[in-house]
Amino acid sequence: MINRNTENQFKLVSKYAPSGDQPQAIETLVDNIEGGEKAQILMGATGTGKTYTMSQVIARVNKPTLVIAHNKTLAGQLYSEFKEFFPENAVEYFVSYYDYYQPEAYVPSSDTYIEKDSSVNDEIDKLRHSATSALLERNDVIVVASVSCIYGLGSPKEYSDSVVSLRPGQEISRDQLLNALVDIQFERNDIDFQRGRFRVRGDVVEIFPASRDEHAFRVEFFGDEIDRIREIESLTGKVLGDVDHLAIFPATHFVTNDDHMETAIAKIQAELEEQLKVFEAEGKLLEAQRLKQRTDYDIEMLREMGYTNGVENYSRHMDGRSEGEPPYTLLDFFPEDYLIMIDESHMTMGQIKGMYNGDRSRKEMLVNYGFRLPSALDNRPLRREEFESHVHQIVYVSATPGDYEMEQTETVVEQIIRPTGLLDPEVEVRPTMGQMDDLLGEINARVEKGERTFITTLTKKMAEDLTDYLKEMGVKVKYMHSDIKTLERTEIIRDLRLGVFDVLIGINLLREGIDVPEVSLVAILDADKEGFLRNERGLIQTIGRAARNSEGHVIMYADKVTESMRKAMEETARRRQIQMAYNEEHGIIPQTIKKEIRDLISVTKAVTQDKEEVVDFNALNKDERKAMIKKLEGQMQEAAEVLDFELAAQIRDMVIELKNM
């Protein structure tokens, strides 16, 4: 068992002081948390500095904090920002460690069994271990996670109880240490020294923790006593310093002691016998044979190795849980008094709700056809109500909070004023009759001023027809549809910003990375057609695309004003009035955001800050493409090593697309 250090304090580092209505938002959120309020909403308009406000709140309340985002990219962006704000504290990153993941599945219509296939990202696996070990060691921890944090993880008690604690002067033989390391799933490898491994050289044992990537530890023995513990560079063996105490956490999150393992194996065998009887009674002899063969193999592996592929499917037995009981997750590694912040909650809470059902239907198929025992159903994500039971205090963060969040709390803290003084755009409704000619005139007016235009349509056909029409009228226009790959998409956005073309047409322009300060006009066609993209939240998000420019303007083309349109316009006008009053009172003149145009599709050496090298990928021959892939993979590794996961993911997408060219 390891004792958590609760004395560390969060220390926020920033050259900016809170401005606009950030001070009021921070004060209200902190007062409510300290007053014991369970749930509240931070409703912050686009570009108002919500992450900075979140950081200020974390520093003030000084609680371990879990920040959940709805995808890896956004989690990576938040992680980078929090690392900058809290350089002296433990800012951790916990997302799915699969670069590629094909879950185990069975398709009865074609009698196809799809074995689990995955590629584990070693860097992310390290960071996951770093997150869980930090949560057990200290209090000043921020974990930025995707919704994978509600998936089953091993028992935190078993994980904590399995920690091997070492100190100079401690009486323990070398062989006892080696056995202890094997028990927590470390591998002995005297040649290839990597994370989760140890090597032995006489009376010296070198251990490479699962949560590290550069530094390892050297334990020197004198007889049956530890003489000295040193931190070393894993590659060179260079000594970095002496260590008074070393805690070695297990190399896997699914770990159990020998007694619990025997009990678990007995339960697995008993369940197997029960399920075989069920299959035989139903005449499912093939399923029975399949299940017995697979389970017997897994039991043998658990007995001999303490581990098997797919061990998580037996986690209910290994954790000692009852049928239907929720699994342990990352949330169980936090102390009781912790804070949850849900970023883009209108998206993230929907994901949390939907995870359980999708997982359940796939696993039921595996159980029904003899690929897994029924207990595999309890290796699952949390249901939403189970997630709610883990909530001590929570802040939902969104420009457009969903109905669920609004039902949870009446406490809504607004953040409307932008530090740049920028206003929400003016919004007007125009009739659909003659909309093409009207829109053409508006576009030409923007082109003359060197500004750009977004047009959002509801159908692919309308987008294509509009693109053709505008091209005939001499407008430089492009259409961005869902089939466009990442590489092309980033190139299109860059070309729009540079003025290679002036108008971008799309169906859903709400995706992250579409904030373009040069866009002063957003045109919404078929604004009165109710649906996902034309509901109140969708419209507010689309309107926000024009909020980065001081000349921001939105035109909705519609024959009637729907309830969603009315609410979106009223909310935008309300925010705009507040922003204008603040600017007038403080003498602020709105300034368009000056955002550097990064050559996203060029081979950027961002890690070393060298100058950019622009490459036309389409002009490369086969050998040049191979060389480029190798070069990019090196840069991807460098980006990951300095924790710039956003860039690493971008480069990874380029590599994938280059391989497919």
From Swiss-Prot:
<dbReference type="GO" id="GO:0009380">
    <property type="term" value="C:excinuclease repair complex"/>
</dbReference>
<keyword id="KW-0347">Helicase</keyword>
<dbReference type="InterPro" id="IPR004807">
    <property type="entry name" value="UvrB"/>
</dbReference>
<keyword id="KW-0547">Nucleotide-binding</keyword>
<keyword id="KW-0227">DNA damage</keyword>
<dbReference type="InterPro" id="IPR041471">
    <property type="entry name" value="UvrB_inter"/>
</dbReference>
<dbReference type="Pfam" id="PF04851">
    <property type="entry name" value="ResIII"/>
</dbReference>
<dbReference type="InterPro" id="IPR001650">
    <property type="entry name" value="Helicase_C-like"/>
</dbReference>
<feature type="domain" description="Helicase C-terminal">
    <location>
        <begin position="435"/>
        <end position="601"/>
    </location>
</feature>
<keyword id="KW-0742">SOS response</keyword>
<dbReference type="GO" id="GO:0003677">
    <property type="term" value="F:DNA binding"/>
</dbReference>
<dbReference type="GO" id="GO:0004386">
    <property type="term" value="F:helicase activity"/>
</dbReference>
<dbReference type="InterPro" id="IPR006935">
    <property type="entry name" value="Helicase/UvrB_N"/>
</dbReference>
<feature type="binding site">
    <location>
        <begin position="44"/>
        <end position="51"/>
    </location>
    <ligand>
        <name>ATP</name>
    </ligand>
</feature>
<dbReference type="Pfam" id="PF17757">
    <property type="entry name" value="UvrB_inter"/>
</dbReference>
<feature type="short sequence motif" description="Beta-hairpin">
    <location>
        <begin position="97"/>
        <end position="120"/>
    </location>
</feature>
<keyword id="KW-0234">DNA repair</keyword>
<keyword id="KW-0963">Cytoplasm</keyword>
<dbReference type="Pfam" id="PF12344">
    <property type="entry name" value="UvrB"/>
</dbReference>
<dbReference type="InterPro" id="IPR036876">
    <property type="entry name" value="UVR_dom_sf"/>
</dbReference>
<dbReference type="Pfam" id="PF02151">
    <property type="entry name" value="UVR"/>
</dbReference>
<dbReference type="GO" id="GO:0009381">
    <property type="term" value="F:excinuclease ABC activity"/>
</dbReference>
<dbReference type="Pfam" id="PF00271">
    <property type="entry name" value="Helicase_C"/>
</dbReference>
<keyword id="KW-0378">Hydrolase</keyword>
<feature type="domain" description="UVR">
    <location>
        <begin position="626"/>
        <end position="661"/>
    </location>
</feature>
<dbReference type="InterPro" id="IPR027417">
    <property type="entry name" value="P-loop_NTPase"/>
</dbReference>
<keyword id="KW-0267">Excision nuclease</keyword>
<comment type="subunit">
    <text>Forms a heterotetramer with UvrA during the search for lesions. Interacts with UvrC in an incision complex.</text>
</comment>
<dbReference type="InterPro" id="IPR014001">
    <property type="entry name" value="Helicase_ATP-bd"/>
</dbReference>
<dbReference type="GO" id="GO:0005737">
    <property type="term" value="C:cytoplasm"/>
</dbReference>
<comment type="similarity">
    <text>Belongs to the UvrB family.</text>
</comment>
<dbReference type="GO" id="GO:0009432">
    <property type="term" value="P:SOS response"/>
</dbReference>
<dbReference type="InterPro" id="IPR024759">
    <property type="entry name" value="UvrB_YAD/RRR_dom"/>
</dbReference>
<feature type="domain" description="Helicase ATP-binding">
    <location>
        <begin position="31"/>
        <end position="186"/>
    </location>
</feature>
<keyword id="KW-0228">DNA excision</keyword>
<dbReference type="GO" id="GO:0005524">
    <property type="term" value="F:ATP binding"/>
</dbReference>
<dbReference type="GO" id="GO:0006289">
    <property type="term" value="P:nucleotide-excision repair"/>
</dbReference>
<dbReference type="GO" id="GO:0016887">
    <property type="term" value="F:ATP hydrolysis activity"/>
</dbReference>
<keyword id="KW-0067">ATP-binding</keyword>
<protein>
    <recommendedName>
        <fullName>UvrABC system protein B</fullName>
    </recommendedName>
</protein>
<dbReference type="InterPro" id="IPR001943">
    <property type="entry name" value="UVR_dom"/>
</dbReference>
<comment type="function">
    <text>The UvrABC repair system catalyzes the recognition and processing of DNA lesions. A damage recognition complex composed of 2 UvrA and 2 UvrB subunits scans DNA for abnormalities. Upon binding of the UvrA(2)B(2) complex to a putative damaged site, the DNA wraps around one UvrB monomer. DNA wrap is dependent on ATP binding by UvrB and probably causes local melting of the DNA helix, facilitating insertion of UvrB beta-hairpin between the DNA strands. Then UvrB probes one DNA strand for the presence of a lesion.</text>
</comment>
